[in-house]
């Protein structure tokens, strides 16, 4: 696969016989534009992160099938089937580069790609599935004719033993060495005879997923070797920075432009903080009110959040001034703090309009002594976190679920569960950004306010 | 060894003969006997041939270091335990055993490198010390059946409960050959209260831990502990063909015949309450209880009573089984609870698990761990297995001639029969097949290198 600068793309000549799911066995000989390199990868990453979220929430297989279908259609679809296929293949190989670089990354990528493959496979019809099995070059023969007749009775017994009252012996069975389907053997879901398991078409997933997983696992090791020995150095000015950024990227909206839901004024701010701020921002806000001061990290995290929430520059200046001057005096405020607030709004210096921090960035920050920024789910002690959650109104039962997620280091899921407990509603998308929390919360609260009497 | 040679060995042997005459009947085992056993009777070269799997150095395709990569462990007197022992060849193994007199010898896996040199290799990366081959093994111990045998408990075993092991051998052996297609299977008496099974096909030796675990789970039916009364739960509308075959060919007949005769599982209130607890319907339980409490004054034998009650139970369940899904196969569940094999899953799941070697002597009983013929396992009697003292006595009275190879018919020594069986029905077919495999993979390798021109 060759990555090129923006040029007309040469039509790809890959004669992939049309299976709907490519197997990523070899990197295809096509040219890829540099922009596509990153864009395709980002789209696929959205799908994989969606899969990850679904699994962490314990979705059952059918729900995962639907989730994968939705995610794929949303991010990877293209009206032109061959373009869609190319995007599929290219994005996978780019992400291999991204995720081969450490054991932890490899493990995540392998799990998600395998799950993605499993559910995409399940969504295919039987003919397509058979074609894919064939693509793997698995030497499994379909059992037919007299051999199948001789086995029919016992195959029916297997089906009945699994809880189906009238045995529908499927049309096709595959004769597979029993070693290749250990999970089907262990649960006695297949007939075994003379070392061969008779796997029904509908059970093919197990077989195929094992092969897929094993292949990707080996490929990642090879890719890693190539990366560390040649590619990383060779591409240090071109692809390497993109690859390194992709594994930590946040993929949601950036909230730099506030929306209709999110205009707040100074008068409302205390009330809104209590009702709609996520825990991290509530804490910072309370500390500002309490201490009339915040250190730099906290000023950045809260300040940008407030901008995203719709606080205008003038109101922001008034807010910070009102608090800080209780401690440091008006002149010092103008000299030392006002400038950086204006800077955040893009009115000073290089005039970049800074974007509010996403959860990922906040979680990775390192608050020190005297700091109050960061993610409470990560950075607070258990006792402090429980106290804070109590003040938000969580019951002790709700708190347990949240603490469980915290123990498993799923900080964003913990925040999502808090959201769900506070508003009594489910948040399927999951919280990825404090401003998202705020917007969702406002949506719910506004929909609950009774219409004004006429 | 000839009689002359035995007598010329000097005082040592004669002193032992005197000792034997004065021995207490319980003294089946002691270190001196063990020394003589290791000196004269332990079949070193047979064990070596087995575990070499044809790599005897005679064929260019042989791996001469194969035997040396096998782990052995010795348990010495006073429970001193030596792991990661390995031997270059049969004679170094023999020397080590004769100088250590281990009370127990365990066989482990074949590793990627000589276990002796394992510290030179890291645990990660490409040059690792890791198991590469190991027989698929099973361990069946009668103590796992304590909740369903009434004649003995703990370490004891008798002619009434040993048949449970016999049935287990039949069920597992049939499955290993019919379902899994294995051909080279060795069953060995564990010396006191159970059996071990060694599956030695090349395919079996190369199985991963995951695959071993899958086979062990395939065999697993009993999921019991003190907390549940219904320890076998057969769901679905029929039995899986493997379970159905085991039930029809072995378990049902055994339960309704021999088991009732030896264990009389319905004859007293304690016993039948246990069975009633397996029926998940209180009404049926009360109905049967009512019938049985009142017939206590019957003049029938215990066995006859049990059979009558079993018939009553079956009839009642047959008419009522549609009442709930958990009653559908309640009759089968009861039969399985009492008769289906109970293997120790942990032994089978990991390649590096050590298992006692055949032809060891059990320190508590003095009995030799002899092979069992799975096709004739009804004939096997654990209480008739030669003990160490019997063997020593036989040597001293000049009755054994250890040239087992010559004069097959006239050799009646106690151990010779077992060794002959080991050779003819297990070792010889195994080695023949190993040699064929080495030959053919060598030919393939040669063929491949002829075709390539890599410089």
Predicted regions span which residues?
Chain B
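SsDNA-processing nucleotidyl-transfer enzymes
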Residues: 24, 28-154, 345-347, 363, ...
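Residues forming anionic-ligand binding surfaces in small-molecule and nucleic-acid pockets
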Residues: 18, 126-157, 222, 227, ...
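Long, charge-rich alpha-helical interaction segments
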Residues: 219-334
């Amino acid at each position: 696969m060759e990555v090129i600068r923006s040029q007309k793309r040469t039509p790809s000549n890959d004669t992939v016989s049309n299976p709907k799911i490519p197997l990523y066995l070899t990197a295809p000989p096509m040219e890829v534009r540099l922009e596509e390199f990153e864009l395709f990868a980002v789209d696929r990453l959205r799908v994989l992160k969606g899969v990850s979220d679904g699994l962490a929430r314990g979705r059952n297989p059918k729900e995962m099938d639907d989730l994968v279908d939705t995610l794929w259609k949303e991010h990877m679809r293209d009206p032109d089937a061959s373009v869609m296929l190319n995007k599929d293949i290219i994005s996978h190989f780019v992400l291999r580069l991204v995720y081969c670089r450490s054991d932890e990354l490899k493990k995540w990528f392998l799990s998600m790609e395998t799950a993605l493959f499993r559910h995409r496979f399940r969504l295919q019809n039987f003919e397509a599935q058979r074609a894919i099995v064939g693509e793997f070059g698995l030497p499994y023969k379909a059992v037919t004719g007299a051999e199948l007749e001789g086995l029919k009775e016992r195959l029916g017994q297997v089906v009945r033993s699994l809880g189906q009252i009238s045995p529908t012996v499927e049309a096709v069975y595959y004769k597979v060495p029993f070693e290749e389907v250990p999970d089907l053997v262990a649960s006695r879901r297949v007939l075994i005879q003379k070392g061969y398991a008779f796997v029904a078409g509908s059970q093919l997933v197990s077989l195929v997923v094992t092969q897929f997983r094993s292949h990707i696992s080996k490929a990642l090791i090879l890719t890693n070797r190539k990366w560390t020995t040649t590619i990383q150095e060779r591409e240090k000015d071109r692809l390497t920075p993109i690859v390194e950024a992709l594994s930590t990227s946040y993929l949601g909206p950036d909230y730099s432009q506030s929306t209709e839901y999110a205009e707040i004024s100074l008068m409302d701010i205390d009330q809104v903080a209590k009702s709609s701020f996520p825990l991290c921002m509530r804490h910072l806000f309370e500390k500002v009110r309490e201490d009339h001061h915040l250190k730099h990290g906290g000023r950045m995290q809260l300040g940008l959040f407030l901008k995203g929430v719709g606080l205008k520059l003038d109101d922001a200046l008034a807010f910070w001034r009102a608090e800080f001057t209780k401690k440091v005096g008006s002149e010092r405020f103008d000299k030392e703090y006002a400038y950086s607030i204006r800077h955040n709004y893009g009115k000073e210096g290089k005039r970049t309009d800074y974007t509010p921090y996403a959860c990922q960035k906040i979680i990775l920050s390192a608050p020190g002594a005297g700091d109050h920024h960061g993610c409470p789910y990560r950075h607070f002690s258990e006792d402090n976190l429980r106290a804070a959650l109590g003040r938000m109104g969580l019951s002790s039962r709700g708190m347990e679920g949240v603490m469980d997620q915290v123990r498993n280091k799923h900080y964003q899921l913990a925040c999502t569960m808090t959201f769900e407990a506070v508003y009594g509603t489910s948040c399927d998308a999951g919280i990825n950004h404090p401003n998202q929390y705020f917007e969702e919360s406002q949506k719910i609260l506004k929909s609950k306010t009774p219409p004004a009497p006429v | 060894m000839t009689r002359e040679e035995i007598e010329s060995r000097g005082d040592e042997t004669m002193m032992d003969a005197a000792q034997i005459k004065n021995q207490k009947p319980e003294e089946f085992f002691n270190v001196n006997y063990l020394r003589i056993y290791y000196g004269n009777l332990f079949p070193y070269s047979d064990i070596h041939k087995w575990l070499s799997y044809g790599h005897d150095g005679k064929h260019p395709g042989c791996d001469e270091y194969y035997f040396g990569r096998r782990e052995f462990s010795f348990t010495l007197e006073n429970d001193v335990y030596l792991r990661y022992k390995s031997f270059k060849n049969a004679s170094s193994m023999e020397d080590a055993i004769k100088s250590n007199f281990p009370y127990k010898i365990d066989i482990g896996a074949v590793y990627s490198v000589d276990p002796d040199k394992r510290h030179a290799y890291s645990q990660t990366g490409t040059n690792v010390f890791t198991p590469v081959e190991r027989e698929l093994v099973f361990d069946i111990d009668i103590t796992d059946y304590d909740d369903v045998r009434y004649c003995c408990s703990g370490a004891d075993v008798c002619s009434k409960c040993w048949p449970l092991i016999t049935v287990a051998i039949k069920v597992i052996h049939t499955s290993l050959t019919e379902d899994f297609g294995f051909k080279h299977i060795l069953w060995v008496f564990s010396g006191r209260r159970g059996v071990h099974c060694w599956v030695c096909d090349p395919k079996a030796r190369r199985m991963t831990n995951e695959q071993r675990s899958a086979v062990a789970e395939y065999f697993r039916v009993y999921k019991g502990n003190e907390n549940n009364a219904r320890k076998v739960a057969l769901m679905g509308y029929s039995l899986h063909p493997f379970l159905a075959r085991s039930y029809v060919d072995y378990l049902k007949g055994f339960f309704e015949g021999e088991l009732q005769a030896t264990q009389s599982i319905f004859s007293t209130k304690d016993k039948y309450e246990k069975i009633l607890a397996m029926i998940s319907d209180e009404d049926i339980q009360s109905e049967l209880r009512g019938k049985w409490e009142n017939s206590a004054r019957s003049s029938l034998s215990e066995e006859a009573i049990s059979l009558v009650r079993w018939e009553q139970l079956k009839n009642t369940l047959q008419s009522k089984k549609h009442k709930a899904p958990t009653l559908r196969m309640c009759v089968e569940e009861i039969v399985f609870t009492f008769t289906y094999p109970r293997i120790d899953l942990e032994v089978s799941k990991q390649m590096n698990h050590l298992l006692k070697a055949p032809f060891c002597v059990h320190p508590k009983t003095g009995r030799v761990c002899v092979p069992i013929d799975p096709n004739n396992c009804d004939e096997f009697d654990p209480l008739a297995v030669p003990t160490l003292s019997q063997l020593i006595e036989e040597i001293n009275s000049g009755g054994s001639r250890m040239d087992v190879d010559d004069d097959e018919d006239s050799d009646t020594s106690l151990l010779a029969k077992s060794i002959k069986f080991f050779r003819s029905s297990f070792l010889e077919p195994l080695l023949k097949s190993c040699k064929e495999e080495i030959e053919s993979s060598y030919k393939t390798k040669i063929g491949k290198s002829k075709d390539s021109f890599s410089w």
